[in-house]
Design a protein with these regions (language model features):
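Ser/Thr-rich, low-complexity intrinsically disordered terminal regions
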Residues: 17-142
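Sec-dependent bacterial lipoprotein signal peptides
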Residues: 1-16
């Protein structure tokens, strides 16, 4: 009985390791403003609109809304969007000259409730995961 309990516990802990919004990080020798420009331009080319933009801090959030017809009917849901959050992190050690590009992919579902619209995180769609990898691939070698 004890072995079964340990096995069930181990499987439960392993199952909780999955993340809703996967993050991809890559270190590059690129200059931070160039990296920011590349990531923002790539997001726009992928039909995302920048909704939060901090070029000085090296961070932005981009969203792309899509039709709910592809997902099927849900009486409360009236909007779904793919979200890309991009962080450009400068190295503290100036001698190394590395910059980290961090891209997080996610999906938000907006539901109408009695309190008003509520955004709920969903598992990242395959499209937004692919778009995040595209940005990393394009900009890591800039």
């Amino acid at each position: 009985m004890r072995r079964i309990w340990c096995l069930v516990t181990a499987l439960a802990v392993a199952g909780c390791g999955a993340t809703l919004w996967p993050t991809t990080k890559v270190q590059t020798k690129s200059y931070a403003p160039d990296l920011y420009g590349c990531a923002a331009a790539s997001a726009r080319a992928l039909k995302y609109s920048l909704v939060s933009n901090d070029s000085g801090g090296g961070r932005f959030e981009a969203r792309r809304k899509y039709s709910l017809r592809a997902e099927g009917p849900d009486v409360d849901e009236y909007e779904r969007a793919d979200v890309l959050t991009v962080d450009i992190i400068k190295s503290r050690n100036d001698s190394s000259g590395t910059t980290t590009l961090k891209v997080q992919a996610g999906t938000l579902s907006t539901h109408g409730t009695k309190r008003g619209p509520t955004e709920d995180p969903e598992y990242a769609s395959p499209e937004v995961k692919k778009d995040a990898q595209t940005i990393v691939t394009r900009c890591a070698s800039t």
